Amino acid sequence: MREILHIQGGQCGNQIGAKFWEVICGEHGIDQTGQSCGDTDLQLERINVYFNEASGGKYVPRAVLMDLEPGTMDSLRSGPFGQIFRPDNFVFGQSGAGNNWAKGHYTEGAELIDSVLDVVRKEAENCDCLQGFQVCHSLGGGTGSGMGTLLISKIREEYPDRMMMTFSVFPSPKVSDTVVEPYNATLSVHQLVENADECMVLDNEALYDICFRTLKLANPTFGDLNHLISATMSGVTCCLRFPGQLNSDLRKLAVNLIPFPRLHFFMVGFAPLTSRGSQQYSALSVPELTQQMWDAKNMMCAADPRHGRYLTASAVFRGKMSTKEVDEQMMNVQNKNSSYFVEWIPNNVKSSVCDIAPTGLKMASTFIGNSTSIQEMFRRVSEQFTAMFRRKAFLHWYTGEGMDEMEFTEAESNMNDLVAEYQQYQDATVGEEEYEEDEEEEEA
């Protein structure tokens, strides 16, 4: 079985993770004690991807939970699914990272990291054939960003050939939780570019917009936002967990989505977007799903795909539907909007179909796109970073933990290079390619 090891870090990561496990347990018919109460064999057929079977037929999530302060973990443990996790897999410190990336990456986090790695090793040894890791974290705080990226680089060293997928919550353009978000996010992206295989980019503002605009929720909570994220997370891996006509796994996803190794930041979407109450009315058709899925308003990060071009995209459909219709609809999208796809990657949209729809829906689809417009996110963070860094504002919090200014400069230029790379491929056409390559050789 191709297992996935799930790791959640920091407050944001743990809250998203908690929601995610609620969704996964629901899909596989696992109750709050870890017993199976499902109605079909399909739910248990490949349950090993995310669960370990313990004694007495109890299913235990393959999850590692870490944080530098006990608060979030305590509330998670006393929450509805708190008893399902393996108690040893909660790893937490007492001091907190105080929204400081350096604390998470170099001081506090570095002290805790070995105990986290021990748990990761133990879980990895329990796997038949570990496919990879998925990490939930935010990039604006201290633990998820600093310690999260530290863990990713350590896992990269130890398991170089396993896939590393992250669900990363970026700082939002207008809603800011902490002043130093741009620092933390830039330092994190610097790490993610090098050490992660695929990053699903999320941000709270886009999620709020979906809640207001599409779901018509008057005052959305983080619970509602995390609900959206977990629907997408479940969609990305449903092909591994349920039988389907066209399967994909983390590696197939990466091969189809990443034309150049550094450009592995994806925007994700989900359809049908219905608020939690009104689910039973939405019987959608494949064309409607497709249309909603490609809609710019449904993207879960604050970048507009219409401002760039898709290098590649992938769609996972769930439910009983004809693959022929799926293929027709996807071709249809590409033909009608050909200007939004780079023409030097023909057939750059991959679709997969999984027969089992998510709980409470007839059919659904998850969208993962590699669009050059994601540079808007990086550009925005980079501008805020530069504004503060030029004045060396707040820098003493980081240098006090032993960081060097040089590291900031490197992270800044890595982020700017990334933006430039996206821009280069956005502007590239079929004819220009040879000419650009010659130029690069001359420069080199």
From Swiss-Prot:
The residues listed in the UniProt record as binding GTP, with positions renumbered to this chain, are 11, 69, 138, 142-144, 204, 226
Can you tell me which residues bind Mg(2+)? 69
According to its UniProt record, which cofactors does this protein need? Mg(2+)
Q: Which domain of life is it from?
A: Eukaryota
Q: Where in the cell is it found?
A: Cytoplasm, Cytoskeleton
Question: Which keywords describe this protein according to UniProt?
Answer: Cytoplasm, Cytoskeleton, GTP-binding, Magnesium, Metal-binding, Microtubule, Nucleotide-binding
Is the Magnesium keyword given for this protein? yes
Q: Name one GO biological process term.
A: microtubule-based process
The record's Gene Ontology cellular component field reads: chloroplast; cytosol; Golgi apparatus; microtubule; plant-type vacuole; plasma membrane; plasmodesma; tubulin complex
Q: Which GO terms describe its molecular function?
A: GTP binding; GTPase activity; metal ion binding; mRNA binding; structural constituent of cytoskeleton
Gene3D superfamilies reported for this sequence: Helix hairpin bin, Tubulin/FtsZ, C-terminal domain, Tubulin/FtsZ, GTPase domain
Q: Would I find Manganese among this entry's keywords?
A: no
Q: What does this protein do?
A: Tubulin is the major constituent of microtubules, a cylinder consisting of laterally associated linear protofilaments composed of alpha- and beta-tubulin heterodimers. Microtubules grow by the addition of GTP-tubulin dimers to the microtubule end, where a stabilizing cap forms. Below the cap, tubulin dimers are in GDP-bound state, owing to GTPase activity of alpha-tubulin.
Q: Which family does it belong to?
A: Belongs to the tubulin family.
UniProt miscellaneous comment: There are nine genes coding for beta-tubulin.
> What quaternary structure, including any partners, is listed in this protein's UniProt entry?
Dimer of alpha and beta chains. A typical microtubule is a hollow water-filled tube with an outer diameter of 25 nm and an inner diameter of 15 nM. Alpha-beta heterodimers associate head-to-tail to form protofilaments running lengthwise along the microtubule wall with the beta-tubulin subunit facing the microtubule plus end conferring a structural polarity. Microtubules usually have 13 protofilaments but different protofilament numbers can be found in some organisms and specialized cells. Interacts with TFCA.
Name the record gives this protein: Tubulin beta-9 chain
Q: Which gene name does the record give?
A: TUBB9
